[in-house]
């Protein structure tokens, strides 16, 4: 599928602000334009962006119900009540449980944690989990990354004498559960200044408020920011505002003095000694933590994150790595089977969304499969399987199509649903499958335009190769951490040429190792184009072509050079 390149064309106002900012901070015009496009237009804003400050974290008591939550927690600790820290089985949930449990452990000898089983209990608060709490004398449950829609289950817990403090970041319904406190910055009555916290981030704010109410030093809480960084990266929330501060300091902790559990994962990922980035969390650390909940039970991930000795951390990391290997095999198998179903669709070109179902598919990987189908076909995808008496599924979307809203418009056919704009989960009775499929496909057909089904690459700026040097890279690195709403900048260079030494590499010669030259400046630079072997014949013979790319540092044998990570090549027009 051919990519469409979208160039950001700066306005006259943006160019004026760029020039003013460049004069104030002494950075290159390109970097200053990138900052302006991200809403940073003054030297003071640039300073805060480049060097986030923990003092700029918002007052946690601005969040609705925070005072109630802290008061109830303090009472529970004072009365030595049994407290259960309850969280979802994904990375966000398990890191949130680990953070809250770690922080409260010194203040309670009756603290426990619980992760629901994906297959036996499903997502979120479960009756089984509440019964576990009741049977063990728990009188307060702190739920993390779940609970915002669990109205009936919270009522069930109240009947058993169990209070709930809900810490969630998903979209609430019009009616909130009748909990002691519902902490969610997305509440319609919220005046909290930042609504994009992860579930772990909400848990952190709760602990920040608890610490503040007791005049505890912030230093112990700061050590746990590594967990918020892992959750922010893995849950794909915007890395802006407060999340940028949390991610920035979390990465510092992860790189300088990680906990034993995360150190175990870092070692088994081959990241030891490397400067760990958001991308490393997204593609290496996060999937391994997630694999526990996908293949077995997410409690094992929490056990690892709470590990107290090196040997235990190493052993648990190896177990989780094994789960991840099994997950990869299963993921490939089910993706192949889903593609085979799609190949049988008579009118695939006309379809604006995909719904596939197989009762035998593994529930733990269907979210990954949905992502792969969306990437391949560039259409919203819903992947469904059978779980107990219900059909359950995961949905992923393309830019501009709110899949949560589409699924919400099918709510009368569903037993449960939840999620975000681009990712959601759902469950339904088998007799409603056909009606759901028809309605969802019609909603997509009515709303999605052809441009949304074309993969797009947003290009931040056009660069001459001569502009790419160590000074430029140093300025670019100051924009870390990159992620949603502060993506790693994508650049374009026009009319570059192969120096004559480019070659195919990889086990199946599927990648191109490039050596590029710019005739105008005689600048040479290396690049790698993964999976673009089909372009190799078009770029030979000093023919000019256009590339878009990100810039990386490549260290080999102690020598660091700059390298272009090529995202696309166009030989003719763009």
Each model region followed by its residue ranges:
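Mid-to-C-terminal polyanion-binding domains and interfaces
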Residues: 78-79, 312-316, 322-356, 409-574
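Hydrophobic helix-and-loop "lid/oligomerization" segment in the mid-to-C-terminal part
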Residues: 2, 10-140, 160-161, 211-438, ...
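Short alpha-helices
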Residues: 99, 177-216, 221-233
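Generic beta-sheet signal
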Residues: 114, 144, 165-169, 183-185, ...
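Acidic-glycine-rich active-site phosphate/pyrophosphate-binding loop
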Residues: 75, 171-184, 516-521
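Short gly/pro/ser/thr-enriched loop/turn and capping motifs at secondary-structure boundaries
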Residues: 119-121, 150, 170-175, 189-190, ...
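Hydrophobic or amphipathic alpha-helical targeting/insertion segments
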Residues: 157-165
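Intrinsically disordered, low-complexity regulatory tails of plant transcription factors
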Residues: 150-151, 235
